[in-house]
Amino acid sequence: MQLGMIGLGRMGADMVRRLTKGAQQCVVYDVQPAAVERLAQEGVTGASSLEDLVARLDKPRAVWLMVPAAVVDGTLEKLVPLLEPGDIVIDGGNSYYHDDIRRGADLAARKLHYVDVGTSGGVAGRERGYCLMIGGETQVVERLEPIFSTLAPGAAAAPATSGRNPGSSTAEQGFLHCGPLGAGHFVKMVHNGIEYGLMAAYAEGLNILRHADAGKHAREADAETSPLRRPQLYQYDFNLADIAEVWRRGSVIGSWLLDLIAGTLAGDADLQQYAGRVSDSGEGRWTMSAAIDEGVPAPVLSAVLFARFSSRGEADFANRVLSAMRHDFGGHAEKPAAPPASSQG
């Protein structure tokens, strides 16, 4: 099948490579000509403009957008006038499902089809395959199945689920038509909210292990410091790289995320290349908005989202307010920041 790909960033380019390896034909475009040229040197058909890309595609066309959510509308403003009835636009980025519904209605008025695809797999997807969560019209999604099946990991990516009827759904292949327009990005939104929680649990657990030698370090004994009452219980120097490694092997908390952090800790036990400012790209906020609208409790997901805000310094003023109040009502002096802990073991 032929596909136009707009956006050749860290995922888009590798998706094209996986599609090409799987015998699908791609025509590619990016606002950065160098990104197009790199794939052209690998034998992929490059386009010099959106007009050129559309002209090179057979009708009815299928065009996949792999661009940041913030630029989807701007890209569509330029792309849609070039398309014809029956053409398909696929948004494979992390758009808000509300926007999918709006955009789909706008395109339907022009007799164009819109499909939303939540794409998970990151930079490893080229080899591992991509988990695809899809929303849109059934017949349109079925038309695109050669693309989805090529991008997806396939049934061999995970053991068969006990009690499940084999072949009952494309979910076993790593792609799923989740429902009508917006459903794909809704499922991906919640997926990313869960991802936030998993990442935070690993981070907090490893941090507790890192500070398990607290009993070896003297603390000031005054009214401003909560004493460590039994320092003899905190005398451990843990090798976090080794702990992450042993957890990978047969542990109930084993996962790809753990594989990644184990590899990082093996090369940089102190994680010195990271400042600890954790971004959030929108999906966590949208997940919480959905939970509030649905009246569904999600305390873990809300806590980890707020923790990301705090990591970027957004809590600094609030903390200064707290410190000022303690000083004003009780004369409590503010303690200087503790030096960063060094690596263990």
Task: Identify the function of each model-found stretch.
Residues 67-69, 94, 119, 152:
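Short glycine-/small-residue-rich Rossmann-like dinucleotide-binding loops
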